[in-house]
Amino acid sequence: MEQSIRSIDGSRSLSNVGASLIDRESINQRALQLLQRNRRRRLLLNRSEDKARYIQPERSASSQQIHPPEHHISAHERITKARGTRYKPTDLALAEIRKYQRSTDLLISRMPFARLVKEVTDQFTTESEPLRWQSMAIMALQEASEAYLVGLLEHTNLLALHAKRITIMRKDMQLARRIRGQFI
């Protein structure tokens, strides 16, 4: 492309630049024409499966039976096709676990957590001297609390697996806190 713009002596010539612009414009025009022609063709295609839904079959006087269309698709098949593939709950759970293990985002919403922190601190302070929180302090507290909860749930899951179960129960959580040396 650079070669077509330069003239024989190496300097740029406007005639070559103008020619390349005209070539680009003609290519764009041709592409637009092809696109419009394809759109018109798609609109003109016969859609027999759509017509079969709305056009009533012809009834002859000799027979009152209506034959169903040969390519009949049940409503259930249509719905499942529209939805796409359905995954097993275990596959969905594993995909969700992988998603959250990859991310480093906080899982508890910021505003409800901040309200909870302020509510708890209001119980331990007097009304005359309310305690104020910086946003960074609340974020640090949220990071620490989420790390604590994740660790506790990991230990709880290990205890459930040790009991040959995959469902965590209250007794697993209590035992995990007791082993850690925390109150039940």
Swiss-Prot record:
Residues 54-81 are annotated as: Disordered. Ubiquitinated. Is degraded through ubiquitin-mediated proteolysis when not protected by its association to the kinetochore. GO terms for cellular component: CENP-A containing nucleosome; nucleus. Gene3D superfamilies: Histone, subunit A (1.10.20.10). Pfam families: Histone. Residues 82-182 are annotated as: H3-like. Keywords: Centromere, Chromosome, DNA-binding, Nucleosome core, Nucleus, Ubl conjugation. Its main location: nucleus. Histone H3-like nucleosomal protein that is specifically found in centromeric nucleosomes. Replaces conventional H3 in the nucleosome core of centromeric chromatin that serves as an assembly site for the inner kinetochore. Required for recruitment and assembly of kinetochore proteins, mitotic progression and chromosome segregation. May serve as an epigenetic mark that propagates centromere identity through replication and cell division. PANTHER family: HISTONE H3-LIKE CENTROMERIC PROTEIN A, HISTONE H3.2. This is Histone H3-like centromeric protein CSE4. The lineage of its organism: Eukaryota, Fungi, Dikarya, Ascomycota, Saccharomycotina.
